[in-house]
Every structure is written in C-alpha cells, then in structure tokens.
UniProtKB/Swiss-Prot annotation:
Part of the 50S ribosomal subunit. Contacts protein L32. InterPro entries: Ribosomal_bL17, Ribosomal_bL17_sf. The gene is rplQ. This is Large ribosomal subunit protein bL17. Belongs to the bacterial ribosomal protein bL17 family. Pfam families: Ribosomal_L17. The keyword Ribosomal protein applies. NCBIfam families: L17 (TIGR00059). One of its GO terms (biological process) is translation. The keyword Repeat does not apply.
C-alpha cells in the first residue's frame, strides 16, 4: 500500500518511473538544465538534490551510491570534484524550476529545471 508516500506516480509503473528519473537526473547533471513537464520537474528536483548532497559529502560510500544511480560513471566523478566548491555554502536548494509555456500537442504545463 502506498499510504502517505510523497513521490508522484507520473502515470508509470515503478520500474519505468525510476528509469525515467535516473535518466532525467543524469541529463540535468550533465547539461545543467532540462525542459520537461512540471510534474516531472518536481519529482526530479528531489532526486537531483539527493545526488548533489551525496557529492558534497564526498565519502566512498556516497560515491558508490551515486554511481549506482547516475548512468554515467565519468559524470559522477566530475560531479564529486565540483560539488564542494560550487555548493559548499548551500544547505539545499540546488535546483530552480521555472515555468514555461504549455506544450502545443496536449497543453501540458512545461517547466525548465536548472542547477543553481
């Protein structure tokens, strides 16, 4: 039972939802910004901030957890090198969600999520 779980379902089974969020997180860390739907951006924020917090910690266990989540191993190493200097003084709020115009085909609310 899913009582009081705050993770949005995104109209997908659990394995597809996890793969979608892993892919979006990898793309966000690689490129710095992603254009997606508002619901996906809100779900992505949680995962991306968790990965950046792991990178700030910098321990071997944190690195292994990040490698298990992010698809690109080299991207994990670069994230761990840059996270302390980029986000060292922040205690959270590493991402920003900006709403954009609705998608033409189905009128879905779109958003840009970017790293601060």
């Amino acid at each position: 039972m899913r009582h009081q779980l705050r993770i949005p379902l995104l109209s997908k089974p659990a394995d597809q939802r996890k793969a979608l969020l892993r892919g979006l997180t990898t793309q966000l860390i690689r490129e710095g910004r992603v254009t997606t739907t508002k619901a996906r951006a809100k779900a992505l924020r949680n995962e991306a901030e968790r990965m950046i917090s792991l990178a700030k910690d910098g321990s071997l266990a944190s690195r292994r957890r990040a490698i298990g989540y992010i698809y690109d191993k080299k991207l994990v190493h670069s994230l761990f090198e840059k996270a302390k200097e980029r986000y060292g003084d922040r205690e959270g709020g590493y991402t920003r969600i900006v709403r954009t115009v609705s998608r033409k085909g189905d009128n879905a609310q779109m958003a840009i999520i970017e790293l601060v």
